């Protein structure tokens, strides 16, 4: 960044420091007492590094921050654009987490769920967590979005392939148990995924 300013409040004091192109231009300063807690970061992108543009696209930021609000249930994010004569502001807060993500996708695609309840599964192993939210709709296409540590894994990964494999196996086990399929028949992965919207999110500590 061309410049960056950081302000940290720890509940007793407020601290401030400024950097220019990665170098501190002044020492860390205690700017006074405060009961507030939190961190504020302001910066200006460096045109010498980002040669194509240093302009921020509001829709891109909104899409990314909304994604983060879905993936972290209860987080409150405010996106405010003050570049124009009329400020634009969006408040992002989803107590339903990735379940709300599935609802949002269905509304934006204009499709209708074919069962009322969004299926939600969560598991924890130490500090590692996994979440799945899924619901079938009246379309013929599937949409599986997977994330690792809040990063969209566009090329999939073991968390996504594992989910698909487990879902297909579970559907086949159920169908055979209740005689919905003959013993020599089975659903394919494509059969099981048709019309499915699913969010798979894992959060892993560093190995």
In which residue ranges do the predicted regions lie?
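GHKL-type ATPase core
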Residues: 1-104
């Amino acid at each position: 960044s061309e410049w960056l300013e950081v302000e940290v409040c720890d509940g007793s004091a407020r601290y401030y420091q400024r950097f220019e192109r990665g170098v501190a231009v002044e020492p860390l300063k205690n700017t006074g007492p405060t009961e507030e807690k939190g961190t504020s970061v302001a910066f200006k992108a460096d045109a010498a590094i980002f040669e194509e543009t240093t302009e921020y696209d509001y829709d891109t930021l909104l899409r990314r921050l909304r994604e983060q609000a879905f993936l972290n249930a209860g987080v409150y994010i405010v996106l405010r654009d003050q570049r124009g004569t009329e400020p634009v502001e969006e408040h992002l807060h989803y107590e339903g987490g990735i379940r709300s993500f599935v609802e949002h996708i269905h509304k934006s695609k204009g499709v209708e769920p074919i069962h009322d309840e969004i299926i939600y599964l969560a598991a924890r192993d130490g500090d590692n967590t996994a979440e799945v939210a899924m619901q079938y709709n009246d379309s013929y296409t599937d949409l599986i979005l997977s994330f690792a540590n809040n990063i969209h894994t566009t090329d999939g990964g073991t968390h996504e392939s594992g989910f698909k494999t487990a879902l297909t196996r579970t559907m086949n086990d159920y169908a055979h148990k209740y005689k919905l399929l003959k013993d020599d028949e089975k659903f394919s992965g494509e059969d099981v995924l048709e019309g499915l919207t699913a969010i798979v999110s894992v959060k892993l500590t560093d190995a």
